[in-house]
Amino acid sequence: MKGILYVLFGGIVSAASDRYLDDESLNTVKSEQVEAIRLADLSQTGIYGINGFIKQGNRLIVGPTYMQEGVAQTIDLDHPAGKVLSSKAVVSSKPFRTLSAFNSWDGKSVTALDFKTGELIENAVSPLTRGITETSVIQLPRGEQHLIAAKTNDFVISTGFYGEGRYLLYSLVDGSVRYCLSYPDCPDYPVLQEKTKGMLYASSILRLRPDGQAFVCADMYSGMIDFCRVSPEGIERVKLEQLSYPRVEISETPEPQVLYRKENRFGFMDIAVTPERIYALYSGKTYARDRQGAFVSNRLLEYDWEGNLMQTFNFDVGLRGITYDEDEGLLYGITGDSKMSVVKLKL
């Protein structure tokens, strides 16, 4: 998704670089150094461009960025260099889909969004672990550019280049559509079109609480993290935190364009949730100082669902993704290096 957004928005522009400054708000809570234990090397699996993952027992359900059939492939962690357990990973007669927003609300299925078509594709997890792909498709409302989506049994929440609100709430019961809440502001550009704000905060991570009654949405290109509830009336914002604002150059004529400066501080790389907690991988780095290291995180922020920061965790290895194994009650990550190692975090 990050590479795609560079093309859409014009890339990163040069500017005088700042030295890296830590967020003072993160220093007000307890911080611990934790160990990341490497478990398996995924570099030999043939899967590249990971869009997200979940872990169940000794199986890793991985969402690649490009797929011809379904949204995920399964890796046996006991034999990670062996055959990927997916009978339809390559179907020569079908075009490749470009996927984003890999998600799993209840652990029983995984979804990803084909943002070129607005189709939310769902695979049941149990068949995937046996090498079988069973796919269903939900077409999100046409006429909009959808970018990120997550679903429960009753509704889909998505973000996109929307002119009527930050979030789209799409009912799977009656097909109704509601746009909810405003976009976060950008102090350097206080007056922007809504769709331009949609571009500014397009690269996001969205995770639903397991009961489907709340969600968290965080920006990858700034320190914005939004805590929300879902009710019969729509979406209610509980708290909006802004650890850093985007440092950008924006033009709206003739067409909206967003360019990120090299000193822009990157935000949230991934999020894992439990019924009680939110675990967010936070970068806080800049391209000017860290180059490609800005796209991995060495810090984990723990929030409650009211948006209160509880504590932070630091680790030596840079992570690009994170997931929570509900059965084990443990957090796992995938490293951002060439080995793409699966690690267990000992919090």
Please tell me what each predicted stretch does:
Residues 115-155, 159, 186:
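Asp-box/WD-like beta-propeller blade repeats and closely related beta-sheet repeat scaffolds
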Residues 47-53, 95-103, 141-153, 203-205, ...:
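Repeated scaffold domains used in trafficking and secretory/extracellular systems
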Residues 261-302:
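Loop/turn-rich, solvent-exposed surfaces of beta-rich toroidal or solenoidal domains
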Residues 11-42, 237-239, 346-347:
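Sequence/structural signature of beta-propeller modules
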Residues 38-70, 272-286:
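Beta-strand-rich domains and repeat architectures in extracellular enzymes and scaffolds
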